[in-house]
Amino acid sequence: MYNKIKTGLALLMLFCLPGLASAQAESKTYMYDHVHMAVPEPEVAAQWYKDNIGGEFIDGRTDRLLFGTTRIMFLNGDAATPSTGGVVDHLGFSFTDLAATVERVRAAGATVSSEVRDVPGLFKLAFIVDPFGNRMELIEDAQHLGFHHVHLRSADPQATFAWYEATFGGIRTNLRGRMDGILYPGNVWLLISQADATFPSQGASIDHIGWRALDSAETIADLQAKGVEFTSEPRDMTLPNGIINFFYVQGPEGARIELVHRAADMR
């Protein structure tokens, strides 16, 4: 099953194929790009993650990290609401030795809210809250190390899954045959749990999630045709390693979503 998924992702990344038959025929698949977290001191948070979770500095900046092809970026936010219970509830990272990782982050100031437990048929997992208010799931999935998933909350998970699949494509499948999800190029899972109440991501410690736009104009046209609500105009930003173009759209239940076009030579 894992090899089949890897093959499917490789084809999607190379050719930007349309979504599977279960998705809309016109839907294309977008590569997952980043998460942006709001913290009091972005460079301090980035260094904490680099030392304790992993990743490497990227874009010539020390306020962001690269995990595979996914960026974890930190912006200034002094009064951000902790992510727990929000529409973007937590992020997942996978390690070869979960027990050692949990002890490392505990010693570095994280709060371990759920100790390591082995879920039969799935993997070992634990939950922490980092020193900046972000809820994280740490897991031991040898088949998928590094940045692993984004976990949302929704009053209607199936409707929310349908929106993301229709909007951004991906492979709709089950994680280890246990959890419904969408797997995106970049090897990132989108998981959704049922919740009667959430709060929007903007203003929370996990401020927004993001997908890659291979071409901004084509992406805007594609999303407009799907009836997606835009919440900003596209604009450029110059980074030490190139220029990006980005804009924001509204996701279900207050999820803030960014689309980013990166220069061709940017990782």
Where do the PLM segments sit?
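Core segments of cupin and vicinal oxygen chelate
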Residues: 27-77, 119-123, 127, 151-190, ...
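Short hydrophobic/aromatic beta-strand micro-patches
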Residues: 38, 92-94, 151-153, 210-212
